[in-house]
Amino acid sequence: MERIQSDTMKLGDRIKAYEHQFTDYKIDPSLPFIARVDGKAFHTYTKRMHKPFDYRFIKAMQETAKKLTETFDPILTYVQSDEITLLFKPTTEAFLSGKLSKMNSVIASTATYWFSKFIDPETPTVGLPLFDCRVFNVPDEWEAINALRFRYRDAVRNAVSSAARYKVGHKKCDGLNTDEKLKIIGSDWKGYLMEARYGTFYHRVNVEKPVDIDRSKLKPEVAAKIPETCIRTEIQEYYVKLATSWSNSLPYQLDPIYMPLNSPAAGIDDIKNATDVIFRGEDAVLYANGEETTET
């Protein structure tokens, strides 16, 4: 790195020029992009918490993920352990002008603030809860889904390892794969909550709500102008509607089937048209038994 000659630029402009060399990098808003929020040294921060899963910690992470979804408006948020992944669809201009330095710092500081608010003060911790963030583009929708699949699989693998180590100790788990560890855990595995085993997906949805107002205190002509309901946005756990084309041959109408996206039966790893489901809200088509998940 070379020094800018002082006789060609004022001091303030010169210092800003150094700064801009490192802070002007931007994501491409025309492509999907992901923000991965990660707890800094949380192995130490959580070492005194209940094992294998401390539900006070899980709840605080879930609430933090919901606040990040509310604040930054990704199309999908996935939280597992001390990680939160935010998926953003292509747009004309990303928030904070797409500047990576600002996006990383603002998302990380927002996560740190809200987690500190949500964590139960009685939870035994070591050190401070700090988060970092890495924002990056992916080339297309399919790779965006694969990024989520990777995080989902990593979450399950780590959860299985935690439960197995808790049951028999670290040494007996050395060299074992996930299936072998699941055999060690046995029926105890299903006794843990879904969010501990598979993480949780969230998104923003529009919900019709009744207008909460005492119309008896209003003049009739005023009350008549106020609608009975209004549309509000809420952050909810992500459920997918399963495609049931086979039901068209039945002589009766079936109710729609909805499954949480973290379900081991109809989760993100099981959805054949995951890009259409996540990016366009279509009904989910599951892989057939024995059909391999396609990755390209």
Model-derived features: where do they sit?
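Regulatory and interdomain segments flanking nucleotide-handling catalytic cores
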Residues: M1-T296
